[in-house]
Amino acid sequence: MTAMAEQALEAVRKSVTVSASPEEAFEIFTEDFDSWWPHTHHIGKAPMTKGIIEGRRGGRCYTEHEDGSEADWGTILAWEPPRHVLIAWQIAANWQFEPDLKKSSEVEIRFTPVENGKTRVDLEHRGFERMTAGVAEMRAAVGGEGGWGGLLELFAARVEHKARKGEA
C-alpha cells in the first residue's frame, strides 16, 4: 500500500475539553444535538429543520427537512451514557445515505472527566477502508476545516453557552 493510500485510511481524531460534567456533555452532544449541529451539514434534499440522535443502541441518526422528509445518516452501534457512543457513519463519499453497515465508517465519541469538573471529548472517525469509493475525499472532508474539528468547536461553544446561562 502506498503512503498516500495509508493516509487516506488513517482515522481522523479530534478532541475538545469543555466546562461540563461527562453527563452534561454527553446530553448536549446527543439529546441536544440540534442545538449545536449546523443546519448546513446534512444530506437531505430540502433545507434542514432539525437534527436528531435517538438515544439507544440501534437508534437512528437523522435530519428532518422543510419538505417533511427525513434523511438518515447513521445508526447507534453502542450507547453507554455518559461515557461513550459509537455511530455508524452511513454517508458514502458521494454524500448519499449508505444503508449497508458493512460499507460504513464509524464515529466513536468518548467523554472523560478531567480536572476542575471539566470533560475531555475525544472523537475518532475510522473505518474508511470499508467505503467502496471516494475514501480520500471523505477522509479529507471530515478531517478538514469544516469537518470534525470545527464541529467540536461548535459543540464546545454550545456547552459554554449553556454553562453561562445556567442551563447545564
Positions of predicted regions on the chain:
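Short beta-edge strand/loop motif at the mouth of beta-sheet-based domains
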Residues: 32-73, 165-168
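Generic structural detector for well-ordered beta-strands
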Residues: 15-19, 54, 62, 75, ...
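Hydrophobic ligand-binding cavity/cleft-lining segments
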Residues: 1-48
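Hydrophobic-ligand binding "helix-grip"
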Residues: 51-52, 66-118
